[in-house]
Amino acid sequence: MSTSRKRSNKQRPGASVDPAPAAAAGSLWPPRRLIVSLCSLAAAALMVRAGLLEYVVGGIVDGAVRNIITLILCFSAVMSALLWFLRESGHALAWKQMLGYGLLGLVALGIATLRIERVSGDLVPEFRWAWQKSRDTLLARPVAAPPQAAAAWEPAPHDFPRFLGPTGDASLPSTAPALDPEWTKATPPREVWRRPIGAGWSGFATYGTHAVTLEQRGDEEIITCLALATGEPEWHVPVRGRHQTVLGGTGPRSTPSIADGIVYAAGATGWLHAVDGATGKVLWKKDVLADLGIDAAAHEVAVAWGRSGSPLLLDDVVVVPGGGPRSDGPVSLVAYDRATGERRWTVGDDQISYVSPALVSIGGRSFLVAVGESQAIGFDPVTRDEAWRFPWPSHSNSDASCSQPVVIGPDRLFISKGYGVGCAAFDIGPGADGAWTVKEAWRNKAGLKTKFTNVAFHEGHLYGLSDGILECLRASDGKRMWKGGRYDQGQLLRAGNLLVVQSEPGDVVLVEATPAGHREVARLAALSDQTWNSPAIAGDTLLVRNAVEAACYRLPLRGGATNAAAAPVENAPSVEPAADVSEPAPAPVVEPAAA
């Protein structure tokens, strides 16, 4: 072979190169580095789901944070694999284009056709079609019965007249009938009635043979009174307004308070009404935001999940949260005359949270307590002077405070919240100079992380849902006694030595209130949708509801005693054995009285 031919076979400078070999260099299989990355992301996601991340970063990781972190890890894994396939793999260009454009089309289709209706307590979304209306907008106003005679609105011995029961601490009085925990086929809870209801997280308050709650139907928040025996509407009072957010849901979230035949109700949008229980007539009404000079739009940003404080009846006034922003600073609480609706006084200087005003007894003295956005403050209920305060930081548009304070000793107040904060106990008493002092007794950042549930106290121990799992702490030092039973972001009441747990998915569960361990006694399939509402128990009558339906059950009592308010029915609901583990046309509306 000649020298000239050898030179002709060599690449000449500036000659073009066939791109085929470079394209062929891409592999059809992912490289080792991608496999290692995907395995690492999968392992991290499994650690997060197993709760192991809490041991690394502490109690700030709740169910919602776990879901967010898991979503980020899964998204990172999918995007890593997708980018490799589209940019580095040796697959045909047609396959790459098909996958890329197909995914873009699916994303665009989802954005165009789906909407997030709401999320669970752990931020799991529920979707609906973009053209589908919210369920509450499809409901007509409830049809009311003829007005009741005044004599029909008489109290009963075991009324549940306010949020969290007669004493407002999630514990029924010792005089309440004892529940029989043997929910067997022979003696199950019996369903008395069931009916659709509008949106909202309000609970029931009972007075004699009546049950009152709040609901959202379309653009109206409605005070609804039902016959306790039948569930039939007796009257309703609509109020124009609608609160709705993806994270907080739709509708009112406070529970009415009833005394002397008068219903006091507060809406999520800032109104307060006093209604005659016998007739449904509005006696007086107030726009609390306008009355206090609060900018409504700015208030909705600051208190993002809607006003949730239930009215507190204190002597001759009704006390509700105040709020802000306003020109001369926020107001913690505001009181209105129960008879006339005239504003009587305001106290405090903290932005409101989602905790209701409370009257507690500490050190032999009564205190009006406001748990706000940054402080817990105690006021003398007579003079309204501030007696004490201690910091309890939160933000009412993010890591909010929602749980009621609980007295756990002669001089000790317990307080808790979710979002990784946990709980603490404070000793409150008079100092040497007569001024009241506050000293932290103990703190448990990993215990009783009550996101928007409440705690019951019984025989020296505290019981509550901590990040969705039932937990028992010793009140003297905050030590965890046990933790077990996932009921998600539900609610609970204590009836004697039993905990009545309303799980977020809808089941009602009986659990023994004992520090010995988690002992589930019985389970009732009461509701079948997301439930953040607190249950109510009046004698042997259990009232439950969520944003879709309400139901009434007759519970078996020890000794076979019954409550005449709710008549029995023939059909019994489905009761599961304990786990062996630790509308028609709108009704006429009564014209409200002038504000």
Across the structure, where does each feature detected by a protein language model lie?
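Noncatalytic, solvent-exposed loop/strand surfaces
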Residues: 26-576, 580-583, 593-595
